[in-house]
Amino acid sequence: MSEQKLALNEYLKIDSDYLRGDIQEGLDTQVTGSFSDGDQQLIKFHGFYQQDDRDLRNERKEQKLEPLHSFMLRARVPGGICTPAQWLEVDKISSTLTTSNSIRLTTRQTFQYHGIPKRNLKTLIQGLDRAALDSIAACGDVNRNVMCNPNPVESKLHAQAYAVAKHLSDHLLPHTRAYAEIWLDEEKLLGTETVEPVYGKTYLPRKFKMAVAVPPHNDVDVYTNDLGFIAVSEAGELIGFNLVAGGGMGSTHGEVETFPRLADDFGFIKTDDVTKFAEAVMTVQRDWGNRVVRKRARLKYTIVDHGYDAFKAEVEKRAGVKFEPKRDVIIGDRGDRYGWVEGIDNKFHLTLFIESGRIKDMPGQTLQTGLREIAKIHKGDFRMTSNQNMIIAGVAAQDKAEIEGLARKHGLLGQVLSGTRGHSIACVALPTCPLAMAEAERYFPEFIDHIDALQAKHGISEQSIVVRMTGCPNGCARPFAAEIGLVGKAPGRYNLYLGASFEGTRLNKMHKENIQEAEILAELDTLFGRYATERDAGETFGNFTVRIGVVKAVNDAAKDFHA
């Protein structure tokens, strides 16, 4: 392929001196709250995105002011685990260095800050560093935050799986010192050449997402990742993983060459071979991935374009190990288990529902204060889940009452929570996300109220339904793997997707395009009525919509999703 055909981002990476670019110069320039267009792409590798308040965009334009620029920073927290001391620093930063005065738990088991003025970026990153946290590779064309099932019951197996996730996260970090030089004031070592042994000078063609699942729970939505490891155990001990690859949610409205996809099963690998296979998959993607058309640059398209067999053979060649036949595992619920759960270590774990992951103080719900007070006395750890919730983990029996009392006092516990609400997530969308076409987080609680009311009307409130909403088709809340998926098309308008499996092993398919709330609810009212009277015993809503022909099953995303 000729150099002239490469996507613009490829040239930016080549010329960036291993992700340094002109970020330092942009940081020193305070006459504008933004970075240059090129550096806006490079800062993603450092963990943050440039945004602006879209609610104020037109008003500021009329006043001949530049947009109210700010930044969203996402931390790297493998497996979502941090200490109470770290959480107190995370909390302090949100209150002193952001304009949102909140913390947002993400769908990838980490947290992010919104509303960071450019002048506060360096201070914020240094604050994270003091707490042994960072935002390296939380965004950009690299391996992002590695997810791992925060399973509080099978804690021994979880610990083993978490160790793998943490190792992969650390091992696959970029080697460039750009982050340390720019944000932590480390001196650049003259005469030394940066070498990226896995990534190379141009890193990956696109983002790369990885997850470790511990069956039967699939809260990490393992099949939606570029690379997934499904733990296989014998007698409670980890012996290896089923490897899956080629998942991803992002697509573009109206462009049939883009589509969401679930990962393919490739086979079983031993625990000792995980690093070899992870590197092999990533380097095949590095070398085979599309660097001309970014919309077709994810691993899912690489596998589709080159073929499953060719991709598998190349991965085995680079790993130096053959896949064994995949082992039988049960893939089950994707939700979190709310309330207290006892672990095998005689410790207790309290899962708290955080609506859309937004931690802030509101009338009647002082969530941020509550978690701060818990962190001051808690002796275990905090575990963020991929459903945007928080687990207060490792609580001794004698400490339960005090922890629970604080949680109830601050509205973190005691909510009336339907099964559907507990299984549902939404992305941030407006007003900060520049890609959002419609509301998500701000509207989602009200929308779920309507869903709860319809389920009650038809006597199906006991049935949990996975509902997800995003403001655009990039799919940050994994809407295409939801039994009911709403994807923003325009203000107040969404595409309605139906038919995914409850367990996350089948995608959904568009049922209605560009419709408003009234039509969405009318469609669901009718379908809930039929589901109440026509469902088979134990049949989930997603499976029901496929069985009765409301939508066709998506078995091969490249062929079926847009058909």
Curated annotation (Swiss-Prot):
Keywords: 4Fe-4S, Amino-acid biosynthesis, Cysteine biosynthesis, Heme, Iron, Iron-sulfur, Metal-binding, NADP, Oxidoreductase. Its EC number is 1.8.1.2. The keyword Iron-sulfur applies. It catalyses: hydrogen sulfide + 3 NADP(+) + 3 H2O = sulfite + 3 NADPH + 4 H(+). GO terms for biological process: cysteine biosynthetic process; hydrogen sulfide biosynthetic process; sulfate assimilation. Its cofactor is siroheme; [4Fe-4S] cluster. It comes from the Bacteria. The keyword Oxidoreductase applies. InterPro entries: CysI (IPR011786), NiRdtase/SiRdtase_haem-b_fer (IPR005117), Nit/Sulf_reduc_fer-like_dom_sf (IPR036136), NO2/SO3_Rdtase_4Fe4S_dom (IPR006067), NO2/SO3_Rdtase_4Fe4S_prot (IPR045169), NO2/SO3_Rdtase_4Fe4S_sf (IPR045854), NO2/SO3_Rdtase_FeS/sirohaem_BS (IPR006066). It holds the Pfam family NIR_SIR. Binds 1 siroheme per subunit. Binds 1 [4Fe-4S] cluster per subunit. [4Fe-4S] cluster binds at C427, C433, C472, C476. GO terms for cellular component: sulfite reductase complex (NADPH). Component of the sulfite reductase complex that catalyzes the 6-electron reduction of sulfite to sulfide. This is one of several activities required for the biosynthesis of L-cysteine from sulfate. HAMAP family: CysI (MF_01540). Alpha(8)-beta(8). The alpha component is a flavoprotein, the beta component is a hemoprotein. Belongs to the nitrite and sulfite reductase 4Fe-4S domain family. This is Sulfite reductase [NADPH] hemoprotein beta-component. The gene is cysI.
